[in-house]
Structure formats: structure tokens, C-alpha cells
Amino acid sequence: MNRLFILFVIGALFLASCKRDGSSEQSSDLDIPDEVVNEGVQELEISEEVMQDIVQNISSPVEMAALIKSLDVPFSAKYLASVDNVDNYTTSFQQAFNLGIFGADLGFLNMYNKTNSVINYISAIKTLADGIKVGQFFDFVTLKRLAQTNENLDSLMYISVHSFNQVDKYLNTNQRGNLSALMITGVWMEGLYLATQVYKEAPHDAIKERIGEQKIIMGDLMLILENYNKDKQFAHLVEQLNELKALFAQVEIKIIPGEPEAVEQDGMLVIVQNEESVVTISDELIGTIIEKTEEIRNNLIGS
């Protein structure tokens, strides 16, 4: 399931950054009259090499939750965004971003088998998805049934990830890559927030290293967001995240090459270059990153 979630994030980053052909005409029932539609904004292309770097380094919220759980850190609902705020998200900018936030929280809840809370987050996701007119891609009846019966949590995760994949594909093919970028930013932001909050209460080197590694993916994510910087809301988002990026710039990451390894992927033998990353981040710096992450995340979700 972790690999599926990673592919969802990677695909969204890739599609949001590539030039797209085709008519800009959309059916009226699918138009979203909001202030984040990017008209006349030149889009950037991300090279395949850069995308491979993202694949190698991104940490999905599911991976982060799995790491946290493996360290015997007890579950705490206080880390999660409150579903009580969902009705306050009235613009598609807010709805797309918080769709990512709640999607990350859903992965965290699933990892800890908190099925009672899962239902509330599925309902919140439905509200936000309907708000940007992508609710048709979520089978909410099946999702709630799986959550209520505690039946096959792998299936619950799979359907959730597949739904987000469909949403991303739809947004990008309908000239709404900006909303996809917001959704992915929400996913990443919440994953980082969860990690930093856990580390604050239960410091562990593995979590500290994973936090430091976010320096890499943040650089790529900022390229995508800056693509929509002509919109004032995106400009404000980028301005806030640049403060965090400046802190991550002080994190040192050294890549140590390892021995190549032959592995089977999709029935084919491929050579994988193993690498080890050594992250150097001071206690003072990670403390500042924790504070800044909390400040930005809470400001963005309105808590």
C-alpha cells in the first residue's frame, strides 16, 4: 500500500508540472468558479531524471505512519486536523489543500486501525471532494462499509489511494493542475506535521532523519507551486513555505553510493543503484523546523 500511495503523489507532481494540450473548454457543470484558476500562466516541465529523484526520496504519510508505529509510538488523535473545520473551507483553494490534509490523516488512521475515526474523515473528504466536484471518484458507500465492519483494511487503503489517483488524473486533464498541486501540498504538509509532532514528544533518530530528508522533496514541490505564483493565494502559500525551505537549506544530506543490485520489477530484471543518505541536523534546527511547520500548517488549516 505504501508504494501505491507514493505513486499517487509522484503522479500528481509529474502531471501538475507538464504542459498539456487540448481544448480549455469544459462543460459548465464541471466548472469551478473560484479564484485559483490559472489563466495564462506558463507551466514548467520536470525532467524524468528529477522525477526519479522524487520517487527515491519522497515519504508518503503512510510510510511515515508505519515508521512511527514501528517505533511503538502510541496513537494520538491530537495530531490530526479537526473534521469540525470542514465547513469553513468554502473556496476551492481551501478545499483542495485540505483534501490533501485529510487524505494524509486518513492514511495515519488506517495504519493504526482507528476505524471509528476513519468514518468521520471519510465524510470530511466527501464534503471537500464534492466542493471541487470530484466526489464522483470516491466510492464512499464501500469505504464506509469497510471502515464500519473493520473488514479488509488493505482494501480500504487501496480504494482510498485509487480514488485520489482518479481525482488527480481528472484535475490535470481538465486544466486544474493548480488544484492537484494544492492537494499534494496538503498531503506532504500533513505528513511532515505528523512526523514533527511525534518527534517533539518521542524523539527518535529514525524520525529525525526522515524529517531532514524532506529538504529534497520540498525543493521539487516548491518548483510546482511557484508555477502558479501569479495567483495571490499561491503567492502567499509560497511565501510561507519559503520560510520553511530556508530552514531546510541548513540541513546537510550526504549521499553515500552503495553496490548496485539486480532486482526483478514487473517481470523484468533491472539494476538498482543502492544509496545511503546521511542526514545532519542539529537539535536546535529541528526544533525550529518543528515550530515553523506547526505554525504554517495550523495557519493554512485555520486552527
Q: At which residue positions do the language-model features occur?
A:
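Sec-dependent signal peptide recognition
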Residues: 2-8
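N-terminal Sec/ER secretory leader and immediately downstream segment
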Residues: 28-145
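C-terminal motif of bacterial Sec signal peptides marking the signal peptidase cleavage site
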Residues: 14-17
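A cross-kingdom marker for long, charged
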Residues: 231-303
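Non-transmembrane, amphipathic alpha-helical segments
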Residues: 87, 91-94, 106-113, 117, ...
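Short, charged, amphipathic alpha-helical segments
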Residues: 119-124, 143, 182-185, 208-212, ...
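Extended amphipathic alpha-helical interaction segments
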Residues: 152-238
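Secondary-structure edge/capping motif, primarily at the C-terminal ends of alpha-helices
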Residues: 106-113, 132, 170-174, 195-203, ...
